[in-house]
Structures are given as structure tokens and as C-alpha cells.
Amino acid sequence: MPYIDLNADLGEGFGIWQLGDDDAMLGIVTSANVACGFHAGEPAGLLRVCRAAAERGVRIGAQVGYRDLAGFGRRFIDVDPEDLVAEVVYQIGALQAIAQSCGSTVSYVKPHGALYNTIVTHRDQAAAVAEAVQMVDATLPVLGMTGSVFFQQATDLGLRTVAEAFADRAYRSDGQLVSRREHGAVLADAAAIAQRAVSMVASGKVTAVDGTQVPITMESICVHGDSPGAVQIATAVRDRLTAAGNEIRAFC
């Protein structure tokens, strides 16, 4: 039976401000991309999410990002590569301590937001993120976009790369994501998103906004936990994938 992992961004609340339903999402996904306090999240909230993930057997991933709480890590920052190495090491280390205190561990690393998109093509920042992961633990897989410069840099350093696809994001014909600033970048219809996920897994292709069929490789599918109706969307995706004969399990 073919398998696919489901991942979502969690732990992105801050104090009394909550973003999404982390507890409900942890009952659906197999991998949790947990914020590390730079783009979102605060210690008490991250501890709660990691504890809940550990109790449910959900893998914990360090979701590293730019130091940009005000912009939620969705703004490009022209950070010096040496500084970026240090910041990524810091974030992984912080979440690793929290995860270990809950009887779990950080199992992988996934960049967030603008950093994720930037290192698809930005060689210096891609190299910095890959170097930081290797410095912390060279056995940690990195989750990201196939064909990216980041994956090239990670592979050169001997890191395992795990490709993901986005069920609820629009794609360009070059295989990159449509900017969130553009209309229609984030999809909202749960049934359509679920069918799209099944189609991507079965065909290895995704339909771009211009109708182009773009080849895509994936071991994991991302379902965003902060979108309206996120729990319903994630549930529909999991149910449809299972009904189509796919086993839902973590990639690591």
C-alpha cells in the first residue's frame, strides 16, 4: 500500500492569541511543523503543542523562519548568511529542548513562509539553512520543495531531503507556489482540495493556474492549520487519501 505523510504548521499562537486549532489538527496530521519562536509561537504554547504531539505519536518538526514576529515570517529579510546559520541553529536547539522535555524529539526541519520561498532560488540563504541543520544533527531530514536550490545544497551536505506538495495552495507553471498576495493563492473548498490531493498522489502532477500539468514529487502533503476551515479541509484530505488506498503515516 502506498503511503503519504500529512504535515501542518502548528504552535503559531502567541499568549492569549490563538491561531488555528492545534489540538484538532494533531488528530489528523502525522507530522507537526512547530514554530520556534522567531516567526510565531511562545515557550508555553510550544510546550503544550509538543506535549500533545508526543502523546499522539505525531512527529515534531522544527519550523524555522526569519526573525519576524510582526510579519509572521512572511516578509523577505536580507539577512547575512552567517547570521542566518546561527538563527536556524538557535531555533532548532530551542525546540529540541522543548520536545525532549516532553519525551519526544525534533525529527525533521522545515523552513517557514518567506524563508521557505526564498531558498527555492536564493543560493546563499539556502546554503545557510542547510549548513545549520547539518551543524545541529546531520541525520535530520529537511522538508521542502523538490527542485529547489535548498534541496541541492542539502543533498551536497549529505542531508536527506523530503519533498512535499501543497494541497491547498495554487501552483505556477514553473512548479513554485503562487504568492499569497495574489488572488486565489490559497484554496478554500474542502472537497476540491481533497480531490486535488488524491490526484497529485496518483498522477505525480498538479494543475497550475494556467492549466499546465506540472510534474511533482512528494512524500508529504501540507495542509495549513491557519486557514479558515482548516480542520474540515485536513479531515477531508485524510479521508479521501485513505479511501483511495493510501496509508497515512509519517515519513520519518
UniProtKB/Swiss-Prot annotation:
Catalyzes the cleavage of 5-oxoproline to form L-glutamate coupled to the hydrolysis of ATP to ADP and inorganic phosphate. CDD domains: LamB_YcsF_like (cd10787). Gene3D superfamilies: Glycoside hydrolase/deacetylase. Forms a complex composed of PxpA, PxpB and PxpC. Keywords: ATP-binding, Hydrolase, Nucleotide-binding. GO terms for biological process: carbohydrate metabolic process. Its EC number is 3.5.2.9. This is 5-oxoprolinase subunit A. Pfam families: LamB_YcsF. It catalyses: 5-oxo-L-proline + ATP + 2 H2O = L-glutamate + ADP + phosphate + H(+). One of its GO terms (molecular function) is 5-oxoprolinase (ATP-hydrolyzing) activity. Belongs to the LamB/PxpA family. SUPFAM superfamilies: Glycoside hydrolase/deacetylase. The keyword Nucleotidyltransferase does not apply. The keyword ATP-binding applies.
